[in-house]
């Protein structure tokens, strides 16, 4: 397809309330609710009542952290809003370190999701044993590249896929929830008695209760992902709050009903002994459909993989726009999609799939994101003090900021204190290793002549161009 020279190429504001709500729901609900929702129950000392209360409490905590991110996305309504926010609050070096972390954890996330998707997609064909590694990796690579192609076709191509995936995911969870309620009303006496005596079991110690809260809090992660797409949302100051107050209560209700359904059919002991709770539940309720559960989980993970590629490619695009990655990463194709950024992230994710040991090392970087959450809270307070007249269509309730900072700081300190490992030192060194790239290439602006020639060649090869920055800024200013 030839590129129309009269056509303006830039990231457009074309995503509305329905797409944004789908995006949030897909990001929050992963495979955990299908596979292993037993962590909260285990650390609640098998106290059913306490475990359900923990889920409600975690939903409230998730809402506070998501609303903190909402202030960032609404105040800075740009694509990858948190990058602009950190750059304004703490300077370009801190923003680069955030990018530096994302460049390596992003492909690790893609590889982990693709491998898990492949595992559940291929396992039904090996009922009596574990699936071989080679077919699993081949399927993971195929799924990742299919998702990459879909992302390169622009957000319009993703809209229908997200809608289908969200409907399928919510349909499965609704079936589990409603079936559980039906069995609770018409079921045996022991099912009803188990919930009537929900608080009769031993009350957990405070340390175990905190661990249960962490387990549940992770299940709600992903609520702040809209900051990646704030620059492509229509009227972000209105759309973002509406999406949050639709998606999070809906996810909370579904999580509670699904757990209630599991506990109606399975005893706490049976739930803890199961590696795939949804599979065990289906085997008890409708044995004929047991084979379908792995495919349902795969469909759920496929939608998560789509949104993950979408997010990581936008990070590379914005960093390039701000001179912290090569100019090539900010080029767009005729579908207004950052094709090279998508290609880069999918390629790095493919390498991580082949070298699976790398994923274990990359997983140690995840706790670093809690540091960024703490810095974001500090940044919000800093801007409120230094720039009180900055236009803020929305301001989060101040106590929510301190609650979010306390939870995120705990997620950093507790692993270090409870089970210190040498790998955390490696993560710290990796974190500072960004200096080796920042100083010569960004601070001193070292230019590589051969890379400029490569940029011109790839622009012609892939039919891509530098975005019309003036039009993109107009779209941002209009918001």
Curated annotation (Swiss-Prot):
Residues 1-14, 69-89, 151-165, 230-242, 311-338, 382-396, 445-479 are cytoplasmic. Keywords: Amino-acid transport, Antiport, Cell membrane, Disulfide bond, Membrane, Transmembrane, Transmembrane helix, Transport. It comes from the Eukaryota. The chain crosses the membrane at residues 15-35, 48-68, 90-110, 130-150, 166-186, 209-229, 243-263, 290-310, 339-359, 361-381, 397-417, 424-444. Its main location: membrane. One of its GO terms (biological process) is aspartate transmembrane transport. One of its GO terms (molecular function) is L-amino acid transmembrane transporter activity. Associates with SLC3A1/rBAT to form a functional heterodimeric complex that transports anionic and neutral amino acids across the apical plasma membrane of renal epithelium. Preferentially mediates exchange transport, but can also operate via facilitated diffusion. May act as a major transporter for L-cystine in late proximal tubules, ensuring its reabsorption from the luminal fluid in exchange for cytosolic L-glutamate or L-aspartate. This is Solute carrier family 7 member 13. It comes from Rattus norvegicus (Rat).
């Amino acid at each position: 397809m030839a590129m129309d020279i009269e056509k303006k190429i830039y990231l457009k504001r074309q995503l509305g309330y329905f797409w944004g709500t789908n995006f949030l729901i897909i990001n929050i609900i992963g495979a955990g609710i299908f596979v292993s929702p037993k962590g909260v129950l285990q650390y609640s000392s098998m106290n059913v009542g306490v475990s359900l209360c923990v889920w409600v409490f975690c939903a409230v905590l998730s809402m506070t952290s998501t609303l903190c991110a909402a202030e960032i996305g609404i105040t800075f309504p740009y694509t990858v809003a948190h990058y602009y926010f950190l750059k304004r609050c703490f300077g370009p070096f801190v923003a680069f370190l955030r990018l530096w972390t994302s460049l390596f954890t992003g492909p690790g996330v893609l590889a982990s999701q693709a491998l898990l998707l492949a595992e559940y997609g291929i396992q039904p064909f090996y009922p009596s044993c574990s699936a071989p590694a080679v077919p699993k990796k081949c399927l993971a690579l195929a799924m990742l590249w299919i998702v990459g192609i879909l992302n390169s076709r622009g957000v319009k191509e993703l809209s229908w896929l997200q809608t289908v995936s969200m409907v399928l995911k919510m349909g499965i969870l609704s079936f589990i929830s409603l079936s559980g309620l039906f069995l609770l009303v018409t079921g045996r006496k022991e099912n009803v008695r188990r919930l009537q005596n929900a608080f009769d079991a031993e009350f957990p110690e405070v340390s175990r209760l905190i661990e249960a809260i962490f387990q549940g809090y992770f299940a709600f992660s992903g609520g702040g992902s809209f900051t990646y797409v704030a620059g492509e949302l229509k009227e972000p100051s209105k759309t973002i709050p509406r999406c949050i107050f639709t998606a999070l209560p809906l996810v909370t209700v579904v999580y509670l009903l699904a757990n209630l359904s599991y506990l109606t059919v399975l005893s706490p002991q049976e739930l803890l002994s199961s590696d795939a709770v949804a599979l065990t539940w289906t085997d008890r309720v409708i044995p004929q459909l047991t084979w379908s559960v792995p495919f349902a989980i795969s469909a759920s993970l496929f939608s998560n993989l789509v949104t993950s590629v979408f997010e990581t490619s936008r990070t590379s695009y914005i960093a390039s726009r701000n001179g912290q990655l090569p100019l090539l990463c900010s080029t767009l194709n005729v579908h207004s999609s950052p094709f090279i950024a998508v290609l880069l992230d999918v390629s790095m994710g493919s390498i991580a799939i082949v070298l699976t040991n790398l994923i274990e090392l990359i997983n140690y970087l995840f706790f670093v994101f809690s540091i960024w959450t703490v810095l974001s809270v500090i940044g919000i307070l800093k801007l409120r003090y230094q720039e009180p007249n900055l236009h803020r269509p929305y301001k989060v309730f101040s106590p929510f900021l301190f609650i979010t900072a306390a939870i995120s700081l705990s997620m950093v300190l507790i692993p270090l204190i409870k089970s210190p490992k040498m790998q955390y030192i490696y993560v710290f060194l990796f974190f500072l290793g960004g200096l080796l790239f920042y100083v010569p290439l960004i601070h001193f602006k070292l230019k590589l002549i051969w890379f400029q020639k490569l940029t011109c060649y790839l622009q012609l090869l892939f039919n891509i161009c530098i975005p019309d920055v003036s039009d993109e800024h107009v779209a941002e200013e209009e918001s």
